[in-house]
Amino acid sequence: MIDKGQMLSRHDFSKVNWGILAAAALLFSVGAALLVLPLLSSIDESQVITLLQAGAGTILLGCTLLALRHYLRPTLTYRLYEHGVRVFDSHHHKERFIPFEKIGDIYRFRGGQAFGGLFDVTAFRAGADQPWCTVFSNVAHSWRLADVIVDQQLQQRGPLALNALYQGGTVPFHTIEGDARWLWQLLLGKQQGTPTETLRLSATLLTTERGNVPIEQIRALENHPQRGIRLFDGQGHVLFAINYDSLLSADLFIALLEHMIHNRIPAYHNPAMTRPSV
């Protein structure tokens, strides 16, 4: 039996659900009052028609809000535990528990602070053959859930990845081409998007399809909302750049490189750690 630990929080439909229900109830009440008003008072025929039209329009608007609520309801909801995340799929009536240590790839799209996180998206999966679990802003406290998932990946996989680097191994990171199109597929529930490129990080080299970057040359890392992730040499020249949204598990990638830059891992001085990457 999997040890879930204590449940920490629930992440169901966000509070916008109650706002929509309250607004719909108010519209229905106002609409009903407008329809009943002509029956309770002596009003000119022209005014009666106006009131009936206004009442019908108000009720129709309330129905529109209820329909909007249906489409805004998240397919996946979550329970956050000490050792993982419990995922509820309301569409297929299934549930499963994903331990933090099993989370492989994490995708994050940052919509910008100007929108207050409304367009932020996070998705994670246990493996390349597993479906994506999406966390949109219509999930209650989605920002907290996403931050915990990323933080746990850093705590669980970070030490293992660093140990692999120290032992001369490589850590792969998948990237996505056409990230806007792939994000749209996630929004539509088509969660089988496949990364198209793999970066390989070792203690001595960052291997990409555009060329290799020696770790020894990297002196600084920038993670900017607009400019993305950029690696610089000692003269301030850009050695490598990639959009944050295009790199899966970008926070782990940043954490590993920052550790290697700040601690200057002497892998290139150790013959046992300079063998070619696998």
What are the functions of these language-model segments?
Residues 1-45, 93-95, 101-175:
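N-terminal membrane-targeting/pre-transmembrane regions
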